[in-house]
Amino acid sequence: MIKSSEIKKIVNDYSDVKIGVLGSHSALEVMDGAKDENFETTVFCQKGREGPYQRFNRIADQIVVLDKFKDMASAKNQKMLRDSNTIVVPHRSLTVYLGYKTIEEKFKVPIFGNRKLFQAEERTAKKGQYYLLEKARIKYPKLFKDPKRINKPCIVKVQEKKRPLERAFFTVSS
């Protein structure tokens, strides 16, 4: 795990902070909010996926086009992020494309939040997001493991086969 003291040292040298994000579907909202707060933004896109950021040119001050999303973690790009005083705002796609090991051990760029908690966001982790919600006494939707037990209106979330990061939703009542 990258020591927080290493990241603190990097952040202490920052002056005008910029916001960086991996350019998947979640990035548009993150960047729109960053612009609302008057931050400069950088988005890292996989080749062929830069279109939305070019169309909504208000939200991206800099678009970095990569061969693969995982290239965001290259030494060259990490240096560029640090040199430009960038804090990365993470979302699910960052952990999927860069991987936990890379983020925890190699990605020496400040991240908004706690890189130790990313794995806890997994639904399948022993002490994952549902465990944390229960510990915090935060209500969350009931999970039905057997569809035969559904006895009231429910929203069903289905992971798409061809696009593993995407989910389809529909409603049922029984």
Predicted regions and their residues:
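N-terminal phosphate-binding or glycine-rich loops at protein starts, especially the Walker A/P-loop
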Residues: 3-37
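Short N-terminal binding/cap micro-motifs at the start of the first secondary-structure element
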Residues: 27-32, 50-52, 164
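Anion (oxyanion) recognition and catalysis
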Residues: 35, 82, 105, 134
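Short internal beta-strands
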Residues: 39-48
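N-terminal beta-loop-helix "entrance" segment that forms/cooperates
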Residues: 48-65
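Short amphipathic alpha-helix with an adjacent loop that forms part of the alpha/beta core around
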Residues: 71-83
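A short, GP-enriched loop/loop-strand-helix hinge that lies immediately N-terminal to
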Residues: 84-124, 139-144
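Active-site nucleotide/adenylate-binding loops and adjacent lid/helix of ATP-dependent enzymes
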Residues: 118-174
